[in-house]
Each structure stands twice: as structure tokens, then as C-alpha cells.
Amino acid sequence: MNSRILIRGLLFVMSAVSFWVYGKEDSAEKDPWVGWHRPVDANVFTTTKGNNHDSVLFVEPELEYPYHLIISHTPQYAHLWRSKKFSWSSADWELVTDQYKIGNFYEYDDGVKVDGVYYIYEGGKVYTYSGPLEKSNGKWKVSGSFPHKQCDDIGIFYENGLFHMFGEHGNFPHGPDGTSLAHFTSKTGLGDWELVNPKAVDPNPDGGHKYGVGDATIEKIQGSYYIFCDRESKGSPYKVTAWRSDSLSKPFQFLGLAITPRSDEVDDWDNYRIQDPDIAYIPELKRYVMTCNMMDKDGNPGGNFSGSGLKGKDTRVIGVFYSDKKLSQKRK
């Protein structure tokens, strides 16, 4: 009798401890915007344009071509695509040019359009252009700067007259990341950046540098602010994680893993890692999409990636992911 009571007591305590330890994470994981899926099994935008990575997606429903996708390629050129209707596949897009010139960078972090002006951020420089993107090749100008040594591989978000920048901060010893994401603001998006919080996103709340983060993308969804960004640790390649806050001026809370590589398979383009997300709302789908850089290292399915800066059997392509949840009404 006593042993039964003791066992029941232990089970109750274990259950209570389990709830206390995991309750917050379990409730966080129920957030609908943590759920993402591949629209098809091989959700690759294109496999024939060599090393593709670090995409920037502009959605402008008022234009004849509402969708423009800039894909980083080499320091010499990026690629510019456009489409009248959204699709995960380049077969439904038009390649404007595969010799698209912004600057001389291997990658471009993020972009935003404000009051008719496009802004692109990379390497501490802010590029701007006004006019149709189809005519922008070679016409981007360096109009400003940002503190990339304190805030690198950034995501940019504009609201109520302020540019909000979130980027890598601190020294992560196991890869090209930060130990947190810092938050800066600017009224112009071109300079006079003010530090709001060096740890707006903190994957190491207990200190140290177990996790590295970077390459943020930011969106306001149903009244809350979401950041999706890379996270890695020693021996664990990039995955896309989700974070949420009810205010841009408050720290973001970890929700969980949003998009992960299929590391237990051998015949996919995303067996090794998934990173560099860029989020946008697609009105015709009534859902959000993310374009991400997917990397594979085993050469299966492989392809012609020679001369594009990759080594051995490495491949890098852009993959498109859809949010599980749709919006039944106009987003706010």
C-alpha cells in the first residue's frame, strides 16, 4: 500500500516537473506561424542557374508584374526574376537578367520599398533606386551606410516612419554568425542608426555562445511581430527558427524551429542546411511564403555548379516554403 502511494506521488511530481519544464515551449510551439511546409517535395525555384542564395522578394500587387525576386549569385552578378502570378517554380517566372548589377557583393542581405524608393542592404552599404526594377540593372547608388560590425547579415522592416534593422551581434566562434541579433533604428534608413537592444533576439539567455544566429526577416502578422532567422550550433548546421514579440521595442521570445533540412534523407537539395529566409505575404495564396537558401553536400541530386564559388559536391539553390496557416481576411 505504501509503495503504491509512493509511486503515485512520484508520478505526480514527475508530471508537474514536466509541465513546468516544457509547458512554455509547448504553448509557444502552438503558434500557427511556426508551421511551414514545402508546396511540393522538390520545392526548388531553379536548379540550372548555378550557385543561388540570399534572395530578396518584393511583392507589389499594384504593378503589372507584382512579384520580383532578386537572387544573389556571385560578386559580379545577381539574378532578377519577375512574375504576374506567384509560383514556387521559376518555370512560371520570367528571367529579366542573369547579369543583374547592384554592387560588388557575393550576397545581399535584405531589401524594402518605402515611398517609391527601393533600399538594399549589404556590407555596411545602403543601395537605393527609384523606378521599375526591370530598369534598375547597374543603376543602384550607394546612398547610405549601417553599422555592419555591430549588426551584420541584417533584416530590415519599416513601420510608422522608422526603419528597424535586426542583425548579427557578438562573436560566435563556430561560424559566421552573431551570439544575438541586435536591433537598430533609423528615420532615414540611410544613417544615424540608434541601438535599441544588442540582444533583441537572444539564443543564449544563460550566457556563452552555444548558438549562433543571423540573416533575419521580419513581418507583422495579426498584431504581433515575428522574426525568422538562421540558427546553428557546433556540429548542427543552419535551421530557420521563429521568434515573436508584441512590440518591436521588446525582446523576442523563441517559438521553435520553423524550417529544417531533411538531414535523414540523401536525395534532396536540402539535406545539409536551410538558411537566409525572406518572408512575404502573397495575396493570391492568402498565405505567407519564405524563400530560403538550401544547401546540400553529397552531390545527390547534384548538377552543374562549377565556377560559382562552391567546392566539391556542394550545391546551393533557393527553396520556397508556404505557411501552414492562411489568412481569411485582409491582414493588419
Model-inferred region functions:
Residues M1-L10:
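Bacterial N-terminal signal peptides that target proteins for export
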Residues V13-V21:
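Hydrophobic h-region of N-terminal signal peptides that target proteins for export
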Residues K24-K332:
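Carbohydrate-active catalytic/glycan-binding domains of CAZyme proteins
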